[in-house]
Amino acid sequence: MTTLVVVATRAEAAPVPAGLDVVVTGLGKTAAAVATTRAILERDRKGLVVVNIGSAGALREGVEGLHEVGTVLNHDISAEAIRALGYDPQEELRVGDAEVVLASGDLFVTDPAVRDELARRAHLVDMEGYAVAYACRQLDVPVRLVKHVSDNADESALDWPALVDLSARELGRWLADHAPG
């Protein structure tokens, strides 16, 4: 089995253990989907597993630390409107057995009203997880999403550049202990 580690930023990639293949996607769903797809197509897919690591905002009180995601949502798509047109928006993907739900979108969540709305459906929020999972699903490559809480998806998210290093170190330790191949 070969692991491809997918991260949004160089800061999140810095603590990845030597010897693991790493792709830095850039921020947001479009950048993540394109970079993940390109990276998968450039590699032998037999035995490949993608591990998307990164920081995330906590949407609920008491959610902290490191989490493996079981379900990921595309939170800023008009799913009901798309469904009404007769199409499946595939806004929710099951990626593992964990109960943690991650909401991904191109919004940097700092607004308490947005946070509260997302908290009804998810535990964590990020900007890339859904896109990575969707690309993997389309290319029949297994994926794991592992996130570390860096902020509370409120005004503290504006301090993200200062907080991401702690998350990156924790994720690097997790990879050293759990990443296959």
Give the ranges of each region predicted by the language model:
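Extreme N-terminal starter segment of soluble prokaryotic enzymes
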Residues: 1-4, 48
